[in-house]
C-alpha cells in the first residue's frame, strides 16, 4: 500500500531543503534525514493541503538491488510500516523524513530491516 498523498514528499526543492537543513540519524542498514517542515516549498506544487503535517520519502538506490521489483518491495514494506504505526494523532508533527537505504541484501531479511527502521524512528523521536 502506498503512502497517502498528504504524507508524500515531492519536488527537487523539497529534497534540496532536506539535504541542507536536516538532522541525520545513521544505522547499519539505512540513514534517516529529518528536517522541520517548510510548507512554502510545497506551494509551488499546487498542493491544496500544504500544512505542517508529517511527510516522508523513501529513496532506494540501485546499489541496494539492481531489480526494480526488489526495490519496490522494500519500499512497500517500509511504507506499510509507516501507515500502520504513524497514527492520525501523530501526523501533526511538523517534520519531513527522508529514508536512504545503504547497500545490502534486504529481500531475505524483512525483520532485520523493520527492526532497524523502528529503532531509527524512536531514535529520531518521530514516534514514542
UniProtKB/Swiss-Prot annotation:
The record ties this protein, via Pfam families, to:
Ribonuclease_P (PF00825)
Q: Give the enzyme's EC designation.
A: 3.1.26.5
Asked if the record carries the keyword RNA-binding, the reply is yes
The membrane-spanning stretches of this chain are: none
Q: Which GO terms label this protein's molecular function in UniProt?
A: 3'-tRNA processing endoribonuclease activity; ribonuclease P activity; tRNA binding
Q: Report the SUPFAM superfamilies cross-referenced here.
A: Ribosomal protein S5 domain 2-like
What is the name attached to this protein's record?
A: Ribonuclease P protein component
Amino acid at each position: 500500500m502506498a503512502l497517502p498523498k498528504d504524507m508524500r514528499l515531492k519536488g527537487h526543492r523539497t529534497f534540496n531543503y532536506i539535504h541542507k537543513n536536516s538532522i541525520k540519524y545513521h544505522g547499519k542498514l539505512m540513514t534517516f534525514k529529518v528536517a522541520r517542515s517548510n510548507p512554502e516549498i510545497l506551494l509551488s506544487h499546487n498542493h491544496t493541503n500544504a500544512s505542517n503535517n508529517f511527510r516522508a520519502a523513501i529513496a532506494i538506490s540501485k546499489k541496494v538491488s539492481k531489480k526494480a521489483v526488489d526495490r519496490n518491495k522494500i519500499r512497500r514494506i517500509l511504507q506499510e510500516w509507516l501507515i500502520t504505526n504513524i497514527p492520525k494523532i501523530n501526523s501533526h508533527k511538523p517534520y519531513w523524513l527522508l529514508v536512504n537505504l545503504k547497500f545490502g541484501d534486504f529481500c531475505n531479511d524483512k525483520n532485520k530491516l523493520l527492526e532497524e527502521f523502528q529503532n531509527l524512528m524512536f531514535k529520531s523521536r518521530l514516534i514514542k
